[in-house]
Amino acid sequence: PIGVQVKGLFYGAPYYDVPALLAFLSILVTTVNFVVSVEVQFYPRYRTYYSLFNDGGVVGDITAAGEEMLAVLNRELFYTALKQLFTTAGVISLEALVMGYLPLGFNDLMHGYFRTLCVGYGLYAVGNTVLLILLYFTDYKGALGAALSFAGAAAGLTALSLRFDPAYYGFGFLAGAAVLFLTALLRLDRFTRNLPYRILGQQPVVAEEKAGAFTRLGLFLERHSPQKKEEA
């Protein structure tokens, strides 16, 4: 209902797109914080912990290093969420005042979209940070599950919201971001609860070669490439 045709198959929704773009800027604090604080504080402990496994560290040192690493991780994630919470609250509180000075033509509907999407992007930013930590611990299945849960929930609930009043647009993304945040956080808590087993017990005893669909496709194309045929 709020979409407009720009030209041909190119459509836009200015009443939604402009608030969405501005709301997205509110998560820059988390993006920067992950690089300058979370990784800076967490990675040295992470490297020390894994090097003890690789270099034959004693059990006591491994346990102490693991506890320190997880304590730093929990603290940094808490501060990240707190910074994003304060940023989101501040942006929502000041948006009516600031938008009044900008020639963007904000109406009540756009103000509602902006506030809804600020909350959604805040949850998404923190959830995405937790997902990146899952990748640090090589929990690819957990990270994939969290990403798919976000994609499915956001797409499904957004499609459902199209059946209601346009004032409810954006709540589908907000709910999907909440699902991502909770899924990634619960997965990280479960994964790190018994980290030594995850590192040692879930690794294969002998090396295994796994060939998925894309690997087989690549090998097939390589065998049938013109260069291979010329060499044959």
Task: Tell me what each language-model feature is.
Residues F24-Y101:
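Specific pore-lining/lateral-gate transmembrane helices of multi-pass inner-membrane transport
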Residues P1-L28:
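Helix-terminus/linker motif at the lipid-water interface of multi-pass membrane proteins
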Residues S93-G122:
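Interfacial segments at transmembrane-helix termini and the short loops linking adjacent helices
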